[in-house]
Amino acid sequence: RSGQRRKDQAFFAVFNDMSTHQSRTTVWPHEVFIREIQSKLTKQEIHDPAAVPLPPYYPDTPVVRKEWARMYDCVTLMDRNTGRLLKELEEDGLADNTIVFFYSDHGTGMPRGKRMLYDSGMRVALMVRFPRCYQHLAPSLPGTVNGELVSFVDFPTTVMNLVGIDKAEYMQGRSFLGGNRDPEPDYIYGCRDRVDEVFECGRSLRSRKYLYIRNYHPHLSHNQPSVFSDLGRTRQEITRLAREDPKKLNEVQMDYAGPEKPAEAFYDCDADPHNLVNLLEGVLTVEQRAAFRAHRLAYESERLRLRDPGAIPEDEMWRWVRDEKTSMYDILLGKSDHKPELAMAWSAADLVGRSDFQTALKLLKSANPIERYWAILALRAGGYEHRDNLVDYLEDISASVRIEAADWLAWGGSGQKAALDRLVKELNHEDWWVALRACRAIELLGEKARGALPAMKKLYLENRTQKGDGPFYLAFSAGAFLDGLGEKTQPWNFAPGAGAFTPEPK
């Protein structure tokens, strides 16, 4: 609502309801959740932990039930807030000529939701309400469910189409609403990369029926340590059970909580909406095998069509941006000194999980640091007998290669001390993203990296109270390492007024 808007003036407004944000559902201390969320509900609206339906990938414990009920309470408040906005449209006489979109940005902020490539992380609610005067722009009748595949990249194009504006040439999305809708795609492409201090690389391809997932760091758990997420009680409970009493977790639950993950996964989303059964771990039917091959080929084609740079290590991208004095966007379009060989980069990445260690050993000698980087990860995913070949790469000209080699070697063997020394040295790198990669490697080493304790203490103290992404993530990772070794750190607090985030506008 704005007093500056003329009565007949068209408007476009976005309301972000934070009631179901990860901070509310799981991260805030429970007493803060009660004060900020639950206190706004009636007694009848508050959910009984004993009665909430748990997803099958969660262990059924009182801790998990309490927090899942908390999530439902957050959803209830969000629902009420949405109703209030719709009522305001009616009160202002705008409901009969306003198209309303309702959607989330990703799956729930609970474990195995947000940040994951499963449907629990990538599939979200999308409802669109057309008033009678605009129902000719809808793809189906009021109250119906439309099963078309839609991606967020389609939203700008669709809104522009609804108001009669042609999409710009550079826009990738299709228009799924309006008089001249674009055809439905066969697939939706999904990405998973570094989040805060947590390094990861995964991709997905979703058709109406199947979900294909490609994991490029299979040596890492789905449930990697993450300071912000680990403040939640459900995460703590799952991690504790996996470490102390794994027999209390079934196979489905250990798929998330276990120490590793498959390089590839394929799910029948119609028969298995929770993505519990990886079809590649059983015998595929003729139809499933054909679908799997089609999805894998389509994924390999789609990543090039979209110019996905995810196979390029972060430090290499930054080096190009600096050397060529332009954006990564222009570099990918070939508007600078060179056009990245994305096909080469992804081909090297595809060696991970394929057991083709002879090709990986050849790429280890490549002049291209991207190929050397992926060769190390490919060997780490099963080629353990080749680990000693990496000692010389601790002095590689590429920071990405040096650190990846050191990360693996530091877990044991003849090169362990030299590898840890390399990681400690990289903590002083001028680029925070390089220092962070080394810091994360040391964090996950835990007790094996006790020799890095003085350097990690120094790094933590230098960054804990500084502003900016780099210091924030470095303090996350270094602090988690110190906590694991029993050192004293300043607890993280993301509750309102704690100062970690700026307050929300009134």
Give the ranges of each region predicted by the language model.
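Long, internal low-complexity/basic segments
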Residues: 123, 248-264, 269-274, 281-422, ...
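Acidic/polar loop patches that form or flank catalytic/metal-binding clefts of enzymes
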Residues: 136, 144-147, 164-174, 184-190, ...
